[in-house]
Amino acid sequence: MESGFKVTLKDAIRTIPDYPKPGVQFRDVTTLMGNAQAFRRAVDELVYPYAGNRIDKVAGIEARGFILGGAIAHQLSAGFVPIRKKGKLPRDTVRIAYSLEYGVDEMEMHRDAIEKGERVVLVDDLIATGGTAEAAAKLLLQMGAEIVAACFIIDLPDLGGRKKLEALGLPVRTLVAFEGD
């Protein structure tokens, strides 16, 4: 059942060649999210290892991590914490800078969103180079969170993002891998 399940999820993800630039195979997870059965199965599969455990918060990375994280938080009876691009949150925030392919950006969360020692699952739709997820994890750790896991629907293993999170000592859970492109 496991391998058939992964094929089903993989088939629900649209691949758009040469987007946003030539040579890139863009993995469009919105087609999976738009398919009720596939979205439900993805959420259930990401929730399963943590059901019955104490999870205080689910932190979702802007923007598709909000969609996925909200559903996971609901299933785990946990709170939801948005991790956003700089300047999008209205109250006192904590911020971290991280490197992009062509520069630096910042993400932030509300200063009071996490209490020290809270058990958190970090969520986004996809992990590629891992820069954004690594910055989000460091921000949560800086706030005193205990990160139980980092979860993604899609892994692009050739880009090495998973290894960055594992180097921080974080368990990483993904459902579908697209290798070699």
Swiss-Prot record:
Catalytic activity, as annotated: AMP + diphosphate = 5-phospho-alpha-D-ribose 1-diphosphate + adenine
Entry EC no(s): 2.4.2.7
Signal peptide: none
Pathway given in the UniProt record: Purine metabolism; AMP biosynthesis via salvage pathway; AMP from adenine: step 1/1
Coiled-coil ranges per UniProt: none
Gene Ontology molecular function terms on file: adenine binding; adenine phosphoribosyltransferase activity; AMP binding
GO CC terms: cytoplasm
Location of the protein in the cell: Cytoplasm
Highest taxon above the source species: Bacteria
Listed GO biological process terms: adenine salvage; AMP salvage; purine ribonucleoside salvage
UniProt entry keywords in alphabetical sequence: Cytoplasm, Glycosyltransferase, Purine salvage, Transferase
Enzyme class: transferase
Protein family (similarity comment): Belongs to the purine/pyrimidine phosphoribosyltransferase family.
Function of the protein: Catalyzes a salvage reaction resulting in the formation of AMP, that is energically less costly than de novo synthesis.
Subunit description: Homodimer.
PANTHER family linked: ADENINE PHOSPHORIBOSYLTRANSFERASE (PTHR32315:SF3)
Protein name: Adenine phosphoribosyltransferase
Organism: Brucella canis (strain ATCC 23365 / NCTC 10854 / RM-666)
Lineage of the organism: Bacteria, Pseudomonadati, Pseudomonadota, Alphaproteobacteria, Hyphomicrobiales
Gene: apt
